[in-house]
From Swiss-Prot:
Molecular function as annotated in GO: ATP binding; ATP hydrolysis activity; proton-transporting ATP synthase activity, rotational mechanism
PROSITE patterns listed in its UniProt record: ATPASE_ALPHA_BETA
Oligomeric form and interacting partners: F-type ATPases have 2 components, CF(1) - the catalytic core - and CF(0) - the membrane proton channel. CF(1) has five subunits: alpha(3), beta(3), gamma(1), delta(1), epsilon(1). CF(0) has three main subunits: a(1), b(2) and c(9-12). The alpha and beta chains form an alternating ring which encloses part of the gamma chain. CF(1) is attached to CF(0) by a central stalk formed by the gamma and epsilon chains, while a peripheral stalk is formed by the delta and b chains.
Protein name: ATP synthase subunit beta
Keywords: ATP synthesis, ATP-binding, Cell inner membrane, Cell membrane, CF(1), Hydrogen ion transport, Ion transport, Membrane, Nucleotide-binding, Translocase, Transport
Catalytic activity field: ATP + H2O + 4 H(+)(in) = ADP + phosphate + 5 H(+)(out)
Bilayer topology: Peripheral membrane protein
Family: Belongs to the ATPase alpha/beta chains family.
Alphabetical list of CDD domains matching this protein: ATP-synt_F1_beta_C, ATP-synt_F1_beta_N, F1-ATPase_beta_CD
Pfam families: ATP-synt_ab (PF00006), ATP-synt_ab_N (PF02874), ATP-synt_VA_C (PF22919)
PANTHER family in UniProt: ATP SYNTHASE (PTHR15184), ATP SYNTHASE SUBUNIT BETA, MITOCHONDRIAL (PTHR15184:SF71)
A GO cellular-component term linked to this record: proton-transporting ATP synthase complex
Keyword Ion transport found: yes
Amino acid sequence: MSKRSKGKILRVIGPVVDVQFEEGELPDIYDALEVINPQTGKKLILEVEQLIGDNAVRTVALDTTDGLMRGLEVENTGEPIKVPVGKGALGRMFNVIGEPIDGKEDVKDVEYWPIHRTPPSITEQSTSVEILETGIKVIDLLAPFPKGGKIGFFGGAGVGKTVLVMELIRNIAIEHHGFSMFAGVGERTREGNELYLDMQEAEVLDNTVLVFGQMNEPPGARFRVALSALTMAEYFRDVEGRDVLLFIDNIFRFVQAGSEVSALLGRMPSAVGYQPTLATDMGELQERITSTKKGSITSVQAIYVPADDITDPAPATTFTHLDATVVLSRRRAALGLYPAVDPLDSTSKMLDPNVVGQEHYEVARGVQEVLQRYKDLQDIIAILGMEELSEEDKLIVQRARKIERFLSQPVHVAEKFSNIPGKYVPISETIRGFKEILEGKYDDLPEMAFYMVGTIDEAVEKAKKLQKA
């Protein structure tokens, strides 16, 4: 096959374009084809997905196909989509094909890597277990993140997934001096713009690469943008031996984009109309996110749960790949308990005495025990009132309410809305605080003293102020 073979457009069906080539000049699967859109005068990239016979291929467009027509000349680049990787990409914002979209000059000091790569082999992968401190109490205590693991943020619309992701980026950049890659997959353009400006303001942009394929873009762009960001993260792991964070907001939109193009590619839909290749598509992305002996990629994925139905195939398929799940609760958000992480539904494989240590494990389980007992008692309280409880149960309810409030925490990225300075709490302080509440050391303090504070010492200070007032 000649490297720059040329073909012609046969058919355009929305984001799917069929292209015919000469005998013996067919491109390979995942090759990038280029066509000049006569309406805009710009180059459009098509990615080959299927060979459909008669020397024709079926491709998915990575930008709008408005203006394309039959007979237009298409050129095969002979290689997959390549994106810029390396130090020169830090602090910049790209689209799915690696073009800068921040209005600055061209990217310098970078290499170009293809977005389709094989996962590291079993022998290259690391098996050591290490905890990544996030500085967010509820996460560090109840759903600790493994370094090089995959973490899912589950929640419906408007419960604070994106704010939590932004706070983690800030904490990793400032407290750990780490690099972060952010893939905006099918989310609001306004949020992407806010994220960029907030990161500029917080001075964390220089340690981050942003890659966007937003809601207004065709499904092809949304389907591939996570791979573009992952490729950039792989460079820092494999070449520079760094520990990198990869944020994907939102992994559900990645599945959604795949299902949009799947039917147009002629595949029979499966359960709830999703693509039959759902597990494969997810596996190709997730298997590349791992720790090697050189470095690690820790991935935090916001997962929209359609209609709050956790059994939907999209979130259910994602579950199988995760090491920790952080479930955001609408009930806690309604009570103003932010971050609205559900302490009973959120789990982590790392919450094991052999990994986090006996003290951490016992405190975490003690907290969950008290909260579960409080949850069991809520029906009795609603019907008969607090007076009907035993003295022991009354004490459990009081401690549970303090724990619930102490699990809340002011975040740096929401300072300008809340006017409360953000707090970063080390794991040791988190464990000490909850241990002392469980021991009954603060049974005499008002529960409001524990709301929106960092360490337990701040809660004691707040209690003194409340008593004076």
